């Protein structure tokens, strides 16, 4: 199979790429073909996250999203930040953490937003194939020329079942990787083409996420809570509790994977956090609806690899566009996808050979990452408490530890 563009990953970045490219197709009366591969059974199947969503990228990609009934139904009404001691929460004044000001943002289900984006993409002519993971990259003369989907009908022992189907080769003029954090194809091109040369080592965290139905008497639609401190006061961990619609709450706990204590269990720390009085009061008599975990990429600007490679692009969290100081990456991922869609169209239709890295550097993605560039390195080098004190006074540190 051959397409003009193949996109790997049906998250915010991949879908934004597909939509922007298809919009330009329509505007220019062209008929370039676009294929998007998603490993989940449907778009959004692997996206559990409740999310405080900054809508500026969506405003730019689909300005009339309100008229099209995008699932942004709960504007943020109130922000609360706490530093936790074991049995109490100390309120933190908003001016101490200005990046946590969520005025103008929305509490959403990111999975629902991606499903809606998938519908918009299909209406524009994008071919979306859920249930087809991209397992291998295809090369020709040291250039990526497409992907191979995974073989179907393989037993747990790696043997072919009678009804097996071999993977399909999908070739394209441009292959765009939006797999999310630590996507295996993204790791392959970063290593093969030395895209992280002269960059600081990348940093990762693990995030545990749950969706709860809580007591309507305790539910405050539009309330956003962020906490740090106990139960991991010596680690730059963080947590959140978002009051969404329909008496649902999205909760999460993030621990960086550079912790030194070999006996620490991130999952158990999450369970302890849920026992804190500020959190427990909401969850008592509630019902957990779903749960999951995922890796986060949080090295920021200093660790951002080159996003161009021969035959393709890296976008979103496959590259590392998350803004750690905000604990937000959906808006930057979506914007990187929009820019990738335009870059791909210019390259294929107009034969414009510009650097995608220069496109990123001229966008507000770079400005956001630049403003938060000190956040991760200072916490990594000096710890949670001293790091917080130095955050706005220290010059930009380099963080050479992975």
Residue ranges of predicted features:
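FAD-binding beta-loop-beta segment adjacent to the flavin cofactor pocket
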Residues: 294-315, 320
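Active-site-proximal substrate-binding core of FAD-dependent oxidoreductases
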Residues: 342-383
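N-terminal Rossmann-like FAD-binding beta1-loop-alpha1 element of flavoenzymes
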Residues: 5-30
């Amino acid at each position: 199979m051959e397409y003009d563009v193949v996109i790997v990953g049906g998250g915010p970045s991949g879908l934004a790429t597909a939509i922007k490219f298809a919009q330009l197709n329509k505007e220019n009366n062209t008929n370039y073909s676009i294929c998007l591969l998603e490993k989940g059974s449907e778009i959004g199947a692997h996206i559990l996250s409740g999310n405080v969503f900054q809508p500026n990228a969506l405003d730019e990609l689909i300005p009339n999203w309100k008229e099209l009934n995008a699932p942004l139904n709960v504007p943020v009404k109130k922000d609360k930040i706490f530093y936790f001691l074991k049995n109490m929460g100390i309120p933190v004044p908003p001016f101490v953490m200005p990046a946590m000001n969520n005025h103008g943002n929305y509490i959403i289900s990111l999975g629902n937003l991606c499903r809606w984006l998938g519908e918009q993409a299909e209406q524009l002519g994008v071919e979306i194939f859920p249930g087809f993971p991209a397992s291998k990259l295809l090369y020709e003369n040291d250039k990526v020329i497409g992907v191979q989907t995974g073989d179907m009908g393989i037993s747990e022992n790696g043997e072919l079942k009678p009804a097996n189907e071999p993977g399909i080769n999908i070739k394209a003029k441009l292959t765009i990787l939006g797999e999310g954090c630590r996507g295996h194809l993204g790791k392959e091109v970063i290593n093969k083409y030395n895209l992280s040369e002269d960059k600081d080592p990348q940093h990762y965290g693990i995030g545990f996420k749950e969706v709860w139905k809580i007591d309507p008497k305790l539910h405050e639609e539009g309330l956003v809570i962020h906490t740090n401190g106990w139960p991991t006061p010596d680690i730059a961990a963080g947590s959140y509790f978002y009051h969404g619609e329909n008496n649902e709450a999205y909760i999460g706990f993030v621990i960086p994977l550079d912790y030194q204590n070999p006996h620490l269990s991130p999952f158990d720390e999450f369970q302890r956090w849920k026992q804190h009085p500020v959190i427990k009061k909401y969850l008592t008599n509630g019902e957990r609806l779903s749960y999951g975990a995922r890796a986060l990429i949080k090295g920021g600007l200093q660790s951002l690899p080159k996003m161009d490679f021969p035959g393709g692009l890296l976008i979103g969290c496959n590259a590392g566009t998350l803004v750690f100081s905000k604990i937000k990456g959906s808006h930057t991922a979506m914007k990187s996808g929009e820019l990738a869609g335009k870059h791909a169209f210019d390259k294929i239709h107009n034969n414009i050979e510009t650097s995608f890295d220069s496109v990123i550097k001229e966008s507000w993605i770079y400005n956001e990452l630049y403003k938060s560039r000190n956040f991760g390195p200072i916490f990594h080098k000096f710890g949670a408490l001293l790091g917080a004190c130095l955050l706005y006074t220290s010059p930009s540190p380099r963080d050479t530890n992975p």
